[in-house]
């Protein structure tokens, strides 16, 4: 009996010490391309620019998909001028990887820089204090990578510790929070700059009569970048936390390898999403919640704030229904989906940014819609689910 008590006491003692040093998000910045498309008129543009106007039934099907998406607009680097200069991007099966790569290796770091500069400005500290840079994108692959290019664009120290993550998919935003937490808590005085930048040029192509997944991809994804500064030991009076990263977990849903897949081919990045994905995610989300929140005695999912990756409207609806969430719980996720589309890795950071800004505007008590505890959910190929427990901070 005494041995058991000692073990429990030690466990709680270690946990208490760990909580005292949890990583904090100190600043968030976001950026989007200047050009954007209206979802209601996009089917006309898409079938015209890809010389596919004769596919009338396919066009009407695409229009229905866009109308059901609950997306109002999306920002895109792709413009009519760019597509006319590179017509090989507009045909479904055209060899075009070189063209896509040439655009992405230039544009991804630039968009990342815009978001990073906003985060650094809000942080308010000298850029020389950044000790780590973690860059994530599903848009292209290059060496030296986007992390190297961003280091030069920002003028970071040549000794900054860099890590480049390519091809992680939609769960990468939550995974980056997990990685930033581990880095910040393992390096005293560390200041981690995290950047997620996504551009959909790799996935854009004309319609295919055989591949309906392609139409979903053309409707769903948008371009954007998000950045944040993370540290475990913020300086009082000099740095102001926005959220606290409490714990993190990742799990693979068994027997779902083929449910969500992206493959890099000569034609670019191909996309497949099974119709079962919304149901499978809804069936597995609660188990992740229970395991994550059990140590903290939380089991009412309406008592926490939600930063849920909006992979698509059907997924958001199914999870909301399965967990019995109130309509306001996933509002921030729905708002980001409506205004930007699915931003892949950048999505959850956009949601965090929107949430803390709206919480302040609405005169809430905390950055998390007035609540203390919250969860970040990301999911992607695998199916892989990342679960991050976060805490808000009081709004002064």
Swiss-Prot record:
Keyword Acyltransferase: yes
Any one GO BP annotation for this protein: polyketide biosynthetic process
Stretches of the chain forming a coiled coil according to its record: none
Annotated EC: 2.3.1.74
Molecular function GO labels: naringenin-chalcone synthase activity
Pathway: Secondary metabolite biosynthesis; flavonoid biosynthesis
Keywords from the named record: Acyltransferase, Flavonoid biosynthesis, Transferase
Entries under CDD domains matching the protein: CHS_like
Principal EC category: transferase
Reaction(s) this enzyme catalyzes, per UniProt: (E)-4-coumaroyl-CoA + 3 malonyl-CoA + 3 H(+) = 2',4,4',6'-tetrahydroxychalcone + 3 CO2 + 4 CoA
Active site feature: 170
Residue spans crossing the bilayer: none
Keyword Acyltransferase: yes
Family: Belongs to the thiolase-like superfamily. Chalcone/stilbene synthases family.
Protein's job: The primary product of this enzyme is 4,2',4',6'-tetrahydroxychalcone (also termed naringenin-chalcone or chalcone) which can under specific conditions spontaneously isomerize into naringenin.
Name of protein: Chalcone synthase B
Protein's organism: Ipomoea purpurea
The gene coding this protein: CHSB
């Amino acid at each position: 009996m005494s041995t058991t008590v000692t073990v429990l006491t030690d466990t709680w003692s270690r946990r208490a010490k760990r909580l005292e040093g949890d990583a904090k998000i100190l600043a968030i910045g976001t950026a989007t391309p200047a050009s954007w498309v209206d979802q209601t008129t996009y089917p006309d543009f898409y079938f015209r620019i890809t010389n596919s106007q004769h596919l009338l039934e396919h066009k009407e099907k695409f229009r229905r998909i866009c109308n059901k998406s609950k997306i109002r607009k999306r920002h895109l680097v792709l413009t009519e001028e760019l597509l006319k200069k590179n017509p090989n991007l507009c045909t479904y099966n055209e060899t075009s990887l070189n063209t896509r790569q040439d655009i992405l290796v230039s544009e991804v770091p630039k968009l990342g820089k815009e978001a990073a500069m906003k985060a650094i400005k809000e942080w308010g500290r000298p850029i020389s204090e950044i000790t780590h840079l973690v860059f994530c994108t599903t848009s292209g692959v290059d060496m030296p990578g986007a992390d190297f290019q961003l280091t030069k664009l920002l003028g970071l120290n040549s000794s900054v510790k860099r890590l480049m993550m390519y091809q992680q998919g939609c769960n990468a935003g939550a995974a980056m929070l997990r990685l930033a937490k581990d880095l910040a808590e393992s390096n005293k005085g560390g200041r981690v700059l995290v950047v997620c930048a996504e551009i959909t040029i790799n996935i854009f192509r004309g319609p295919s009569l055989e591949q309906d997944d392609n139409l979903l991809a053309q409707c769903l994804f948008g371009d954007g970048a998000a950045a944040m500064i993370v540290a475990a030991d913020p300086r009082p009076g000099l740095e102001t936390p926005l959220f606290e990263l409490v714990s993190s977990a990742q799990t693979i849903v068994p027997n779902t390898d083929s449910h969500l897949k992206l493959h890099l081919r000569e034609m670019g990045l191909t996309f497949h999403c099974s119709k079962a994905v919304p149901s499978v995610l809804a069936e597995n989300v609660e188990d992740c919640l229970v395991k994550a929140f059990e140590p903290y005695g939380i089991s009412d999912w309406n008592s926490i704030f939600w930063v849920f990756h909006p992979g698509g409207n059907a997924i958001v609806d199914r999870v909301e229904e399965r967990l019995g969430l109130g309509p306001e719980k996933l509002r921030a996720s729905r708002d980001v989906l409506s205004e930007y589309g699915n931003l892949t890795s950048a999505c959850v950071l956009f949601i965090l940014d929107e949430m803390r800004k709206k919480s302040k505007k609405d005169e809430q008590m905390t950055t998390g819609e007035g609540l203390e505890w919250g969860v970040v959910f990301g999911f992607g190929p695998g199916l892989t689910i990342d679960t991050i427990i976060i805490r808000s901070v009081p709004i002064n």
